[in-house]
């Protein structure tokens, strides 16, 4: 009787994982979709808050305050990415770490989106030639790019996919250290040579280089996360035959971590496309 009950429990666990074998992929995209939904909710909330501001001076002050909050949230998110990356394979890790990562991402991108919506729907849009339709086109473009890259990520074989993710991971590690050095150099230049001005070390070397580099790494990040989501699916499938409970736990850790990364890479792609739209408009006006 006891053995029969134990077998039933094991069967229900296996049935859960087998039924959810789409789990990592579908659950990851579900987490990302919910995250983007909350980004929109926060964005519209921030827009309503800023739209009620009576003067441009107060509006600028509020935008700076919200920008500081968004920066702090993005910094917390960056720290949590490193912490949770090392905890991703630890079966004893609580999911609170991964939920915290998603929440920090949603707050950061939600506030940024809210500021953009405010710029596109208030009297400020006349000053910077920025429209609400630009944001819509940026989101549609990012969705199209992401869908295309997701399809391309299915082409490599399993072994080739693992090799590509390892190569991209090394590139991201080096890029992280280079970006830290570039940020420090920019910070020093802004408070010494340029006396409080704002510049970018890449744009000093070659105008527009920061946009090009940002675009390349946005696409690489999208491709990497698409490959890795498929790798996580393979891993959970392996765990399924050995330990269904472990497979279930790993499914949630993977879905939350890479769901957050998917949100981050998607929103970065949106902002990159938005910069392209604005740059193209400014160039067309110049000529």
Swiss-Prot record:
The keyword Membrane applies. It is a multi-pass membrane protein. Its main location: membrane. It comes from Mycoplasma pneumoniae (strain ATCC 29342 / M129 / Subtype 1). This is Uncharacterized protein MG320 homolog. The chain crosses the membrane at residues 27-47, 66-86, 97-117, 135-155, 171-191, 205-225, 254-274. It is found in: Cell membrane. Keywords: Cell membrane, Membrane, Transmembrane, Transmembrane helix. The keyword Lipid metabolism does not apply. It comes from the Bacteria.
């Amino acid at each position: 009787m006891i053995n029969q009950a134990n077998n039933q429990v094991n069967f229900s666990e296996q049935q859960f994982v087998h039924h959810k074998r789409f789990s990592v992929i579908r659950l990851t995209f579900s987490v990302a979709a919910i995250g983007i939904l909350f980004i929109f909710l926060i964005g519209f909330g921030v827009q309503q808050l800023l739209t009620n501001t009576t003067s441009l001076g107060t509006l600028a002050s509020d935008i700076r305050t919200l920008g500081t909050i968004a920066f702090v949230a993005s910094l917390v998110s960056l720290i949590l990415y490193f912490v949770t990356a090392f905890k991703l394979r630890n079966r004893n890790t609580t999911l609170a770490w991964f939920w915290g990562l998603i929440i920090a991402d949603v707050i950061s991108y939600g506030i940024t989106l809210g500021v953009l919506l405010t710029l596109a729907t208030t009297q400020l849009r006349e000053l910077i030639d920025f429209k609400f339709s630009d944001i819509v086109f940026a989101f549609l473009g990012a969705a199209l790019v992401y869908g295309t890259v997701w399809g391309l990520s299915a082409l490599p074989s399993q072994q080739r996919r693992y090799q590509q993710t390892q190569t991209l991971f090394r590139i991201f590690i080096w890029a992280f250290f280079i970006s830290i050095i570039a940020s420090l150099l920019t910070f020093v230049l802004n408070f010494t040579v340029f006396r409080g001005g704002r510049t970018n070390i890449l744009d000093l070397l070659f105008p527009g280089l920061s946009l090009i580099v940002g675009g390349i790494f946005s696409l690489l990040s999208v491709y990497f996360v698409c490959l890795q989501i498929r790798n996580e699916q393979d891993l959970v499938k392996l765990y399924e035959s050995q330990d269904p409970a472990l497979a279930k736990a790993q499914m949630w850790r993977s879905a939350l971590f890479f769901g957050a990364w998917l949100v981050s890479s998607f929103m970065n792609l949106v902002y990159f496309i938005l910069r392209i739209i604005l740059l193209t408009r400014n160039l067309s006006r110049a000529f």
